Every structure is written in C-alpha cells, then in structure tokens.
C-alpha cells in the first residue's frame, strides 16, 4: 500500500506543469462600466449620458475622500499618472444636472505568493500561510486549491478560502486533517484582484511528517549561588502544544557571547530544566532551546529567542588596605563542596553529557599533559625500585659483618698436653687430711696441677 502511494506521488510530481495546475487562477471580475487601471497610467473617462455628446461643457466632480472638480469641453475627462487614491466615482454634470457616473479602480497586481504549510500539534488541522511584502489592496482575495491523495479512494479536489489578518499581515488557510491521518496533500495558493492574479508553486506535505511545534516559551537563564561555572536553565511548552497526549523532547544549545560555535545537549523527554556545568567564569552566555514530538514525529521546532545569562560571581573581598579583591576568584574547596551539594540533582535537573566537546582544554594540550604525567609516574616507580634494591643489599652486607659465623672458618687443630702418668712421691701425702680446704686439681689444664691421678686405677688395679 505504501509503495502504491509513493508511486502515485512520484507520478504526480513528474507530470507536466499543466497536469499540476490545481485550479484556474484568474483576475476578479468588476462591475459593468468600471474602468480599471494600473498606478502611473493615463486614464480617459467618458460621461455616459447622450446629452453630454458633442462640445457641451461638462462639469466633473470626484466623490472620493477629497473633493475635486474639473470642467471639460466634451464628454471626456483625461487623468494622468493616476494612483491608488484616485479610485472612486466620478460624476459628470451638464447645466447642474447629473448626467452619469464613471467608477474608476486603480489597483496594484498581486505579487507571487510563497506558500508555507505547518501543523503545530498532531491533534490540530494543518495551516498554510503567506506573508506578502506589502499590504495588499482591499479588493485582493486569496483561495487555496488542494488535492488530497488517498491510496484507497483515489484523489479528491477541493478549495479552501483564505483570510487576511491585519494584525499578522498574512493570508492563512486551514486544511482539515484527522488525527493519525497519513495521506499526502498538494496545495497551491491563488491571489487575485481586479487588475491581475498570481499563483504560488505547489506544496506537497504528509499529514504526520509536517508536524512542527512552536519554539519553547518562557526561557529563563539564571546563576546558581556558589557555583562560578554553573547556569540554571528552565522553559515551558509552547501554548499551541497539548501535553495531555503527546510530550516533547528538547535540545539545548549555548555559547559565550563572543563565540559563534554552539554546544548542543540532547535532553530527556518532558524535561523542562537543566544545569550547565561548564560555563566560563564571569562570561555572559547565549542559551536557546527547541522541541520535537517525543517519538520523532514531524520536525524540530525553530530555536527559541536568545536569552543571556552570566554565572555567579563571588562578592568582592575587601583587603586591610581597602582594596577590593578579585570577584571571580573562588577557592577550589568551595567549588568542590558545592558540586557535592548539587551533584545529586533531581530528575528534572539531571544534566546529560554534552554532544559536542565542551572542555575548554585543547586536545593537544591534554595529550601532552597526560603523557608528561605518565612519564613522571614511571620515573618515580623506577627510582623507588632502584633505591629499594640498594637498601636491601646494604642491609644484607651489614648483617653478615656483625653476626658470628655459624661454623668455624678453618680446620680445627688438636691441642697436645704432656701429662705424667705417675704422681711424684710426697705429693699424695702432702695434700693433708682436709681436701675441702686445699686446692682441688681435677682439671688437666690447671697449671698448678702438673700430675693427674684420676686414672691411677688403670695402672694399679686393686
């Protein structure tokens, strides 16, 4: 079915120009006897009465806003370089007797209309309008010819009357469209008056794809106290949009006043406020918002009018000498504390990451800084490992020099002692009866005991 509709639309657009003429656009008819003319032309008026023929003296009177009179010989009155304000009725008299009336209509032919169609809500009808560059004459009329392309019922032709609004300075026409209707329309605007007519180019639109909301309303940009780089932005749905059945998604864009490049954020559906976190300190910013149907039906609205705002500035601090301090200087701790305080924002004020790069640091600078930091960290780790290894080897060397060796450094040499096997005479008796009070010679290495009698039982068995 869709292929049939597309084929039909292509066939209509590819047809010759004659086949695309939706209706006959002709100049408006005027009453019998009315003389029409363009501005700047020369007009000849003829008194209609028979008695005015010949060389009779005819008195002419203009019945317009300004009273004017002429006297001519004969029944003709010649007006040179007529203007629009010469439009009116011209009365001709013969001997103070009214002979006849000649209507004159001076008009400007209409300019070629440029038709544009839109639909501000999926629940409303479509509107087509044209804004002429100059105010049209009171006799100018407009009508729109339309063809409705229906894949099931063929095509239907109809006309829509258009009204001129003095307040909006435009012609507008309303095309009835049912909710959910996806048919195609081909429309053309015909503008005509008594001296000419012009027709616009054909406009083709699809009922759903042409939906375009009005720009968001009541955009407000304000500073957040204590946040030198934050801006709070809030807005509302346009009055022409009914949020009962269809919601809007939004996009926000902002820039410093001296910049031409915008940073664009996509926002959540039905979100009507957000916080900009990367505004420049003390710099005025331009902010705009636009909207579109939540399921991408139709087109984006136009951007809202520009609204400016400046982030919060710290109050000047007075030094002891009475000189005010820098108002834009804020401590890092205060800024971090404020970020912690506002970091967990509500759903309505949650901020998404910007689509375009919003960091004021250029990419080459960021790469150089990151590479320098990584090189410094690697150098520190290398130095620490070298020092640790050096300290470990030095500690092991000191522990070897201070502690005694666990084993002898060389082979042990036996110690030879000359011990007599026999005790000299008299030695045994001279020891006395009390051995406890005398010196006991039981050790073989004692110099006072040259003889050792501990093994005498070996030599003298009992």
UniProtKB/Swiss-Prot annotation:
Annotated disulfide bonds: 25-190, 47-92, 117-128, 162-173
Activity regulation, per record: Classic and trans-signaling are both inhibited by tocilizumab, a humanized monoclonal antibody that blocks interleukin IL6R signaling.
Region (Disordered): 423-462
GO cellular component: apical plasma membrane; ciliary neurotrophic factor receptor complex; external side of plasma membrane; extracellular region; extracellular space; interleukin-6 receptor complex; neuronal cell body membrane; receptor complex
Domain Fibronectin type-III: 215-313
Segments crossing the lipid bilayer: 365-385
GO BP of this protein: cell surface receptor signaling pathway via STAT; ciliary neurotrophic factor-mediated signaling pathway; cytokine-mediated signaling pathway; developmental growth; endocrine pancreas development; interleukin-6-mediated signaling pathway; positive regulation of cell population proliferation; positive regulation of chemokine production
PROSITE patterns named in the record: FN3, HEMATOPO_REC_L_F3, IG_LIKE
Signal sequence, renumbered to the chain: 1-19
Extracellular side of membrane: 20-364
Glycan-bearing residues: 32, 55, 85, 150, 218
Record bears the keyword Signal: yes
Residues of the Ig-like C2-type domain: 20-108
Keywords in alphabetical order: Cell membrane, Disulfide bond, Glycoprotein, Immunoglobulin domain, Membrane, Receptor, Secreted, Signal, Transmembrane, Transmembrane helix
Residue intervals on the Cytoplasmic side: 386-462
Domain notes: The two fibronectin type-III-like domains contained in the C-terminal part form together a cytokine-binding domain.
Quaternary context: Component of a hexamer of two molecules each of IL6, IL6R and IL6ST; first binds to IL6 to associate with the signaling subunit IL6ST. Interacts (via N-terminal ectodomain) with SORL1; this interaction may affect IL6-binding to IL6R, hence decrease IL6 'classic-signaling'.
Protein family per UniProt: Belongs to the type I cytokine receptor family. Type 3 subfamily.
The protein's role, per its UniProt record: Part of the receptor for interleukin 6. Binds to IL6 with low affinity, but does not transduce a signal. Signal activation necessitate an association with IL6ST. Activation leads to the regulation of the immune response, acute-phase reactions and hematopoiesis. The interaction with membrane-bound IL6R and IL6ST stimulates 'classic signaling', the restricted expression of the IL6R limits classic IL6 signaling to only a few tissues such as the liver and some cells of the immune system. Whereas the binding of IL6 and soluble IL6R to IL6ST stimulates 'trans-signaling'.
The protein's name in its UniProt record: Interleukin-6 receptor subunit alpha
Organism: Rattus norvegicus (Rat)
Gene symbol of the encoding locus: Il6r
């Amino acid at each position: 079915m869709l292929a049939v509709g597309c084929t039909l639309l292509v066939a209509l657009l590819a047809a010759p120009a004659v086949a695309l003429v939706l209706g006959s656009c002709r100049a408006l008819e005027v009453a019998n006897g009315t003389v029409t003319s363009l501005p700047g032309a020369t007009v000849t008026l003829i008194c209609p009465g028979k008695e005015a023929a010949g060389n009779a003296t005819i008195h002419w009177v203009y019945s317009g806003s300004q009273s004017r009179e002429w006297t001519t010989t004969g029944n003709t009155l010649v007006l040179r370089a007529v203007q629009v304000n010469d439009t009116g009725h011209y009365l001709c008299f013969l001997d103070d007797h009214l002979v006849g009336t000649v209507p004159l209509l001076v008009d400007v032919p209409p300019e070629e209309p440029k038709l544009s169609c839109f639909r501000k809500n999926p629940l409303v009808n479509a509107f087509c309008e044209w804004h002429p560059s100059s105010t049209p004459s009171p006799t100018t009329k407009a009508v729109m010819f339309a063809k409705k392309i229906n894949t099931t019922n063929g095509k239907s032709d109809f006309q829509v009357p258009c009204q001129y609004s003095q307040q909006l300075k435009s012609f507008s026409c309303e095309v009835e469209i049912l909710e959910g209707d996806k048919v195609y329309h081909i429309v053309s605007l015909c503008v005509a008056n008594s001296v000419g007519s012009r027709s616009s180019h054909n406009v083709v639109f699809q009922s759903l794809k042409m939906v375009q909301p009005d720009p968001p309303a009541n955009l407000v940009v304000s500073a957040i106290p204590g946040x030198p780089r934050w801006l709070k932005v809030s807005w509302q749905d346009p009055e022409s949009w009914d949020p009962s059945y269809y919601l809007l998604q939004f996009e926000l864009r902002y820039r410093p006043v001296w910049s031409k490049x915008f940073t664009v954020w996509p926002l959540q559906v039905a979100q009507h406020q957000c916080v900009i976190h990367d505004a420049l300190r003390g710099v005025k910013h331009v902010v705009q918002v636009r909207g579109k149907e939540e399921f991408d039906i139709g087109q984006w609205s136009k951007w809202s009018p520009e609204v400016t705002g400046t982030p919060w500035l710290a109050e000047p601090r007075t030094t002891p000498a009475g000189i005010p301090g820098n108002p834009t200087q804020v401590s890092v701790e205060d800024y971090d504390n404020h970020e912690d305080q506002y970091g967990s924002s509500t759903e309505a004020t949650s901020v998404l990451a910007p689509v375009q790069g919003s960091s004021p640091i250029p990419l080459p600078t960021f790469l150089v800084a990151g590479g320098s930091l990584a090189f410094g960290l690697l150098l520190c780790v290398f130095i620490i490992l070298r020092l640790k290894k050096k300290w470990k080897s030095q500690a092991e060397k000191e522990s070897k020099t201070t502690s005694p060796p666990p084993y002898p450094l060389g082979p042990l040499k036996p110690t030879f002692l000359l011990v007599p096997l026999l005790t000299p005479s008299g030695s045994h008796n001279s020891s006395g009866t009390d051995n406890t009070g005398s010196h006991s010679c039981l050790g073989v290495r004692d110099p006072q005991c040259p003889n050792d009698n501990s093994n005498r039982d070996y030599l003298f068995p009992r």
